[in-house]
Structure formats: structure tokens, C-alpha cells
């Protein structure tokens, strides 16, 4: 009876060692779960970026509005009959700001 108990205890010890410290044990499971969580976050960011790019492609393929918006913003184009206005900061405010900075530096 004593030999059987020792054999079962040794088997139990070996199984516990395999479970906690062996290959594919709890430590590996936790590490892999952390890696999966990091990768899922990265995948979510990339999926959002891809969705945005696909939406932009759909706009460019199907709509004039996206083409007009891009021409206005990137090429500074205007439609016939439109008036282009450029808003510039007030010169007196800019001079006052620069003179106050000069006074602070002295």
C-alpha cells in the first residue's frame, strides 16, 4: 500500500509541475493571452484605418463632392462664379503681440 501511495504522489507531483511550470502550462497560457490582447488592439486600429480608407475610396469613386472638396483643399480651386475669400489676422494685433513679446524678452 505504501508503494502505491508513493507512486500516486509522484504522479500527482509530476502532473502539477507540468500544469504550472511545464510547456503549455499556466505561465505560457497567460503570456499567450497577453499577446493576443495586444494583437487584437493593433488589429482594431488597423481595421478602423482600413474602414476609413475604404470610405474615402467609395467617395472618390462615386461622388463629385469628395472630388470638389479635395480640389478646394489641396489645389485651392474654386467653381466658376464663386468668390474666394482669405481671412488674414489683423496687422495691428500682430504688431501688438510681437511688441509685447519683445518687451517681455528685455
Curated annotation (Swiss-Prot):
Location, primary (coarse class): membrane
Keyword list, A-Z: Cell cycle, Cell division, Cell inner membrane, Cell membrane, Coiled coil, Membrane, Transmembrane, Transmembrane helix
Gene Ontology BP annotations: FtsZ-dependent cytokinesis
Chain ranges on the Periplasmic side, renumbered to this chain: 22-106
Annotated transmembrane regions: 4-21
Recorded topology in the membrane: Single-pass type II membrane protein
One Gene Ontology cellular component annotation held by this UniProt entry: plasma membrane
Annotated localization: Cell inner membrane
Cytoplasmic topological intervals: 1-3
Coiled-coil zones: 40-62
InterPro entries on file: Cell_div_FtsB, FtsL/DivIC
Oligomer and partners: Part of a complex composed of FtsB, FtsL and FtsQ.
Family: Belongs to the FtsB family.
Function per UniProt: Essential cell division protein. May link together the upstream cell division proteins, which are predominantly cytoplasmic, with the downstream cell division proteins, which are predominantly periplasmic.
The protein's name: Cell division protein FtsB
Lineage, broadest ranks: Bacteria, Pseudomonadati, Pseudomonadota, Gammaproteobacteria, Enterobacterales
Name of the gene encoding the protein in the UniProt record: ftsB
